[in-house]
Every structure is written in C-alpha cells, then in structure tokens.
Amino acid sequence: MPNIRLDVEYDGTSFAGWQRQPNGIVTVQGEIEAVLSEILQEKINLAAAGRTDRGVHARGQVVNFSTRSPLEHSRIRHSLNCLLPSSICIPSSQLVPDDFHARFSALERQYRYFAIPEPSALMGRYTGCSHGDVDFALMQHLSSGLRGTHDFSLFSREDRDGNGSLCTVREAGWYRHKGVMVFHIAANRFLRSMVRGIVGGMLSAGRGELDPEEYLGMLGGGGGGMRVKPAVASGLFLWRVRY
C-alpha cells in the first residue's frame, strides 16, 4: 500500500490538541482522519511527528498514513484542503518509502515561541505575553545553558510514553523581530509541555521572579513534575521536523 506523507499547518486555538480523543472532542488529528476516511472510503490512522497540546499551533507538522486507494497523493491533498476547516491546511504531500514513519523516522523537532511585552487583542492569538519588560540578555544567557543532554522533567508534565526525561538540545536562543521576542529550540525529542515550561521559567527569570541559578539547576531533573509556570499555549508553534 502507498505510504503518503502530508505536511500540515494549523491554528490550534480551537482544538483540544493534536491527538484524537473520544466523546466528540475536537482535535486536529480527529478532523484530518475524518475527512481522509471520507475521501478514501476506508479508516485512516495518522502517525504524527509531534503531539501538540491544546491551543498550540503548527507550521511544520508531518504525518503519514497508508491507504489502499489508487488516488494520487496530490488529489488527496487537494480534496483535503477543500473539505478541512480553514484552520487546517495541507501545503504539500509526497509518496515516501514504506519504512518512513513521521514520528520514529524524525531526527529532530524544532519549535518557536513568540512573546510580546503587553497583551494584544490582535496578536494574542499567536503570541504569549511577558507582562512587562524582561532582562533579554539574561534570557539569552539561560537559553545557552539548555544546549546538550539534560533531564527536563522539572520543565514538563508527566511523561506519557515511559521513555525517560532526557532530551538532547542542539540549539536554543532568543532573538527579536519587529517588537516580538522569539525563542527557537531544536532537539531530538520533547516532553509534554516542555517548551512552554522552558519559556515560562525564562520569562519568570527575566522579570526577576526566579533566580537564574535555580533555573539552570533544574536541568539536573529530580522528579516531582513541573516546577515552573508554563507559558501560555498560544505563542507556541511546531516549526519544523527534520528527517
């Protein structure tokens, strides 16, 4: 059976996260699978590179599925874009080898978090808020300490997979773009709510509410769950997946 890869963009505001849920709860996976099953006249199960939380967006989610249908992947993509809600878009599709798996074949995931200093009715859908000025240089310093392999259990919610809490971060840093603070991070894997925990802790340190050494010390792990207030979901984007 053909193995088809879809690249997916979505505005996560109105969805209860990526992962399919029971009892009619609206999720991104559930919406795409329902439309695909209608188009292909068979039950479709998507594998995804990342399972984003409620309210988190994606610019570069990757999924794959197998189908018995003879339809070309480009026609499937066109039909999806006609039938899916406007908050979900499939910008590209391709046939991939049988052993390609959106999650397990991924080498690296990249996320970006966008934050503004004050609340905004216009930008708030796609940004978080620092609620005042922050020590930007300090946050840049803290982000450099994230690189390497660390135990991120104190920056994340309980692990659902039982695969441990060690993650290897290749790059992490802050930059400014047109008045918006942007945090970028790339790692081999991410724990549940990990990026929001990392950003929330850095914003707290930038406001002087959390000691920087305490923040860096939490990279040693220790269990007990998230020790920081996570940044709001609206500013977070799954940006790219590298294979």
From Swiss-Prot:
Transmembrane segments: none
Top-level taxon: Bacteria
Record keywords, A-Z: Isomerase, tRNA processing
A biological process from GO: tRNA pseudouridine synthesis
The protein's Enzyme Commission number: 5.4.99.12
Pfam name, any one: PseudoU_synth_1
Keyword Transmembrane helix: no
Enzymatic class: isomerase
Any one GO molecular function term: RNA binding
InterPro entries in alphabetical order: PsdUridine_synth_cat_dom_sf, PsdUridine_synth_TruA, PsdUridine_synth_TruA_a/b_dom, PsdUridine_synth_TruA_C, TruA/RsuA/RluB/E/F_N
Residues annotated as catalytic: 53
Catalyses which reaction(s): uridine(38/39/40) in tRNA = pseudouridine(38/39/40) in tRNA
Family annotation (SUPFAM superfamilies): Pseudouridine synthase
Positions annotated to bind substrate: 111
Chain coiled-coil ranges: none
CDD domains for this protein: PseudoU_synth_EcTruA (cd02570)
Listed HAMAP family: TruA
NCBIfam families xrefs: hisT_truA
Subunit structure of this chain's protein: Homodimer.
Biological role stated in the UniProt entry: Formation of pseudouridine at positions 38, 39 and 40 in the anticodon stem and loop of transfer RNAs.
Family stated for the protein in its record: Belongs to the tRNA pseudouridine synthase TruA family.
Protein name (record): tRNA pseudouridine synthase A
Organism: Chlorobium phaeovibrioides (strain DSM 265 / 1930)
